[in-house]
From Swiss-Prot:
GO terms for biological process: ATP synthesis coupled electron transport; electron transport coupled proton transport. The keyword Electron transport does not apply. NCBIfam families: NDH_I_L (TIGR01974), PRK06590.1 (NF005141). One of its GO terms (molecular function) is quinone binding. Gene3D superfamilies: 1.20.5.2700. NDH-1 shuttles electrons from NADH, via FMN and iron-sulfur (Fe-S) centers, to quinones in the respiratory chain. The immediate electron acceptor for the enzyme in this species is believed to be ubiquinone. Couples the redox reaction to proton translocation (for every two electrons transferred, four hydrogen ions are translocated across the cytoplasmic membrane), and thus conserves the redox energy in a proton gradient. The chain crosses the membrane at residues 4-24, 28-48, 79-99, 113-133, 138-158, 183-203, 216-236, 256-276, 290-310, 325-345, 346-366, 385-405, 421-441, 475-495, 588-608, 655-675, 686-706. Keywords: Membrane, NAD, Quinone, Translocase, Transmembrane, Transmembrane helix, Ubiquinone. PANTHER family: NADH-UBIQUINONE OXIDOREDUCTASE CHAIN 5. GO terms for cellular component: plasma membrane-derived chromatophore membrane. This is NADH-quinone oxidoreductase subunit L. It comes from Rhodobacter capsulatus. It holds the Pfam family Proton_antipo_M. It catalyses: a quinone + NADH + 5 H(+)(in) = a quinol + NAD(+) + 4 H(+)(out).
Length: 712
């Protein structure tokens, strides 16, 4: 069954890409979409019937060279099953949605065949992503990692006639190569120290790696920390974390369904999946985990600030994605890998829905993407408005504080997963991450409601012809939105106990003794007061200190074999347990931030509409700083792009032009004609000239014989 899940999208890609002329373009759409829905249904069957123990499915032998013995296999555990349903569900719905969205694309003429190629690219991406998440060794994972990079390049640059789309595709490809270089170095380092790229061998070797020093770039590093950092650099590139994030907003040049599939729900979460998959290594690398926390927290804050002032509806959601990925990395770095996966799952539902909902708005407004030209659309496209409202309630974290049913808090999906991350950040003792994430939650609420108010409320702005002809999307586009809306509302409550409650150990097949059974409700933690929650004052001081609860290595708890379970939590890791005992003000803080963000968004865009303009004029430097995305693109142009172009130009003009071409052209146009002219003068045609030359030759030959001793 798992093999069918993996290979069905590949079959669809091959048929759609190469066989569409035989089965027609519509036939290719039917085949690719049908195979994706088959893969999706089987993925849910696997997820709901998954046995406790990890399964290893051998497909074929792959690479055998010296100590490297690599097979192609499938690692099936709870982590894999979660990613299977995320990837295949979103991909299947995006395929269905694209039937309507790509039906009449203005970037192509009526006679151009583009749909089969687009659907083939989508299916190929899905196969590469499935190869990544099912891999049983790091080389296979790297091939899937690079496969999604290639598919992303093809899909971002799908409108290859647009220079901006080509530039965005190249930018995404190049920036990701920086992160991939770190990932490759991490794989090589692990193979160098363990003689294996098999995950179970690496996991079993993690305690020894924590005791090993590795010489790298003229310095000595702890091997576990160094290798975990290198792997995380790869995750930073793929998941668009700070410094390697610049490709993600530009990737919105691709078709909107691509944004929903790749840049919201699947490819960008590969980095989070990598950190969670390698949790047995990260648990022995406290400095690397601290780096993950700080990078994630700063990214969440940075992207939220930029999202405050963006005007392109897709770019607002893109920066929202970047920010939410930061939340996931904070959870993973804090050691609560199940919570990171919880937010990954819920985020996939509401972010894919927001992107597809934005696509419905763009479709209604005849491909207008500037929110300043929207307004009053809730009456024109009521179903899309309802969908976008649900997505906004989910991403901003709307719920009922301190109210639960059966131990499950009541709220939209983002309320449960995002609040779990913020509470875990506080419980880990990292005050910096806690306060930064709360601030980011407030800004998330502001820009999300700003999008709603600018798009659906107020008077119509911009081209009145577009407003007059705005219409609801076809049913084939609205049906996927409705299904995603169900997940955006219910996913958090349905799986709360499994990811953050009293079923974590059984759900992820963790030995209870390794970390203590997580207590999923406040009632279950009565009588247990974690150190970080003894008093509100003590908790506040601990948070401000910014010390990590997991800062001490866990090497003393070494195990001789690969740890049991889809994720690994060391015995010293009690963060998920302590998170349920944090003070009430900590639990209320993200809700307060959400309400504050909503209030200011209403004030700026409903209550006092001239206020945004007055604020921008009063703070022009800050406004331009945020509008220009902290000037990261300009900084990278100054430090890397322009020097690289200058060096390339010098090598082209001076190296290729002057040296290589100069040598060849100089030989062809200079020396050869010179010797030709000399030879031409010698060939005079007079007999006595040739006789004189022969005499000179004989004299020279005799002189050489005498000087060298003749025959001796």
């Amino acid at each position: 069954m798992t093999t069918i899940i993996l290979l069905a999208p590949l079959l669809g890609a091959l048929i759609g890409g190469f066989g569409w002329r035989l089965i027609t373009e519509k036939g290719a759409l039917v085949v690719t979409t049908g195979l994706l829905f088959l893969s999706c249904i089987l993925s849910w069957v696997v997820f709901l019937t998954l046995p406790a123990e990890t399964q290893h499915i051998h497909l074929l032998d792959w690479i055998r060279s010296g100590a490297l013995d690599t097979s192609w296999g499938i690692r099936l555990d709870r982590l894999t099953a979660i990613m299977l349903i995320v990837v295949t569900t979103v991909s299947a719905l995006v395929h269905l949605y694209s039937w309507g969205y790509m039906a009449h694309d203005e970037n192509w003429t009526h006679h151009e065949a583009y749909k089969a190629r687009f659907f083939a690219y989508l299916s190929f991406f899905t196969f590469a992503m499935l190869m990544l998440v099912t891999s049983d060794n790091l080389v296979q994972m790297f091939f899937g990692w690079e496969g999604v990079g290639v598919a992303s390049y093809l899909l971002i640059g799908f409108y290859y006639k647009k220079p901006s789309a080509n530039a965005a595709a190249i930018k995404a490809f190049v920036v990701n190569r920086v992160g991939d270089f770190g990932f490759a170095l991490g794989i090589m380092g692990l193979f160098f120290l363990t003689d294996s790229i098999d995950m179970d061998v690496i996991f079993a070797s993690a305690p020894e790696l924590a005791k090993t020093e590795l010489h790298f770039l003229a310095w000595e590093f702890n091997a576990a920390n160094l290798l975990a950092v290198l792997l995380f650099i790869g995750a930073m590139g793929k998941s668009a974390q700070l410094f390697l994030h610049t490709w993600l907003p530009d990737a919105m040049e691709g078709p909107t369904p691509v944004s929903a599939l790749i840049h919201a729900a699947t490819m960008v979460t590969a980095g989070v999946f990598l950190v969670c998959r390698m949790s047995p290594l990260f648990e022995y690398a406290p400095e690397a985990k601290m780096m993950v926390v700080y990078v994630g927290a700063v990214t969440a804050f940075f992207a939220a600030t930029v999202g405050l002032v963006q005007n392109d509806i897709k770019r607002v959601i893109a920066y929202s994605t970047c920010s939410q990925l930061g939340y996931m990395f904070v959870a993973a770095g804090s050691g609560v890998y199940s919570v990171a996966m919880f937010h990954l799952l819920t985020h996939a539902f509401f972010k894919a829905m927001l992107f597809l909902g934005a696509g419905s708005v763009i479709h209604a407004m005849h491909h207008e993407q500037d929110m300043r030209n929207y307004g009053g659309l809730r009456k024109k496209i009521p179903f899309t408005f309802a969908i976008m409202m649900i997505g906004t309630l989910a991403i901003t974290g709307v719920g009922i504080p301190f109210f639960s049913i059966g131990g499950v808090p009541v709220g939209f999906a983002g309320y449960l997963s995002k609040d779990a991350i913020i509470e875990s950040a506080f419980a880990s003792g990292n005050g910096f991450a806690f306060y930064v994430l709360v601030a980011a939650a407030g800004m998330t609420s502001f820009y999300s409601w700003r999008l709603i108010f600018l798009t659906f409320y107020g008077e119509a702005r911009g081209d009145h012809h577009k407003h007059d002809h705005a219409h609801e999307s076809p049913a084939v586009m609205l049906a996927p939105l409705a299904l995603l809306a169900v997940g955006s509302v219910l996913a958090g409550m349905v799986w709360y106990h499994s990811f953050f409650g009293d079923k974590v150990a059984s759900f992820f097949n963790l030995p209870a003794a390794a970390h203590g059974e997580a207590h999923g409700t406040e009632h279950a933690t009565e009588g247990h007061v974690p150190e970080a929650a003894m008093t509100a004052e003590a908790a506040h001081e601990a948070a401000m200190a910014g010390t990590m609860a997991m800062a001490e290595p866990a090497a003393e708890h070494a195990v001789a074999k690969a740890p049991q379970g889809a994720i690994f939590m060391a015995e010293t890791n009690h963060v998920i347990h302590d998170a349920h005992g944090v003070p009430d003000w900590v639990k209320l803080s993200p809700f307060g931030a959400m309400v504050t963000g909503f209030f200011f968004a209403w004030l700026y865009y409903i209550g006092d509409k001239p206020l945004p303009g007055r604020t921008a004029r009063a703070l022009p430097g800050l406004y331009r700083f945020l509008l220009n995305k902290w000037y990261f693109d300009e900084l990278f142009d100054l430090l890397f792009v322009n020097p690289a172009k200058s060096l390339g130009r010098k090598l082209w003009k001076g190296g290729d032009g002057a040296v290589i071409d100069g040598a060849i052209n100089g030989l062809a146009l200079g020396w050869i004609p010179f010797f030709t002219r000399v030879a031409g003068r010698i060939q005079s045609g007079y007999l006595f000239h040739y006789a004189f030359a022969m005499v000179l030759g004989i004299v020279a030959l005799m002189f050489w014989v005498v000087r060298t001793g003749g025959m001796n």
